[in-house]
Amino acid sequence: MRKALIASLAVAAALIVAATATGGSTAPAAVAGIPGCEKEKLGLLDSGSATLTIGADNPAFPPWFGGAEKTKPWKVSDPYSGKGYEAAVAYAVAKQLGFSKAQVKWTVTPFNNSFRPGKKPFDFYITQVSYNPQRAKAVDFSKGYYFVNQSIVGRKGKPIASVRSINGLKKYRLGAQVGTTSYDYIVKQIKPDSSPKVYDTNDAAVQALKNGQIDGLVVDQPTAFYVTAVQVPDGKVVGQFGAVGSKERFGLVLQKGSKLTACANKAIDRLWANGTIRNLQRIWLARATGAPVLK
């Protein structure tokens, strides 16, 4: 998710205390790297200093990112901390490619800009970007580092909170962030009676839910649990939606035709094979489960 209120930060911190205690906050030291993926062959944005530049949206919200605000201009969380699922995955990929933590630089890139055509200010980007063929015309995607269901958030005590089917959602006012698979799911699968509301950011969509401008907000499942735990005090995860067709996946976003893409895929393959990704999911995303499936 993308601005939580300052008063809510203590709650957000509580969500990641257990993960920090289990050691999930550490960013790995550099290793030898992958044969054929030497730094000089990767076409890095900052090749002169052998720095890996990683893009992310700002604010950086849990459970995807963690750590207290420390490095400017990052808000809510700090990717440099290595805490949170996506920060941890990013540093794990960097490690596989032979980069130390000191050789990683984070840069702010708005979500919608990450997959637009044009020159990218990063070597790869990581902020819950789902692969789809249309986006892949403009950018490269890595293999999946997370396979995700969409979920819907309502408010406790409201009629939508008791809905138990997709068909039951049709009469409600639904909303999502522009350009997201969440919005696509509303349009293509739920097909509500009234046109869904679209917002430039998830923050704006959350505010609309709090203000009663929409009845339900569609987001990915881990984000739904963050919304209800931190941003909307009376929020409720009404349910999650099963996969339609192939399973939705989050992938790293890279410049179209990037020399880094094949090596990023090899790194992710290694992280699945050696159990790193599943362990990071256990540490950072274990709380984001349990919502009923709406059919």
Language-model-detected regions and their locations in the chain:
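C-terminal region of N-terminal signal peptides and the immediate post-cleavage residues
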Residues: 5, 16-34
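Extended ligand-binding regions for polar small-molecule ligands
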Residues: 30-35, 89-92, 96, 158, ...
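Extracytoplasmic small-molecule ligand-binding "clamshell" domains
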Residues: 32-126
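A structural signal for short loop-to-beta-strand junctions that line the ligand-binding cleft
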Residues: 41-43, 75-76, 128, 136-148, ...
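Bilobed "Venus flytrap"/periplasmic-binding protein-like clamshell domains
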Residues: 54, 59, 79-97, 129-133, ...
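Acidic, polar ligand-binding/catalytic clefts
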Residues: 102-168
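A ligand-binding cleft/hinge motif common to bilobed small-molecule-binding domains
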Residues: 113, 129-138, 187-188, 210, ...
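Periplasmic-binding protein-like
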Residues: 146-154, 222, 229-269, 287-295
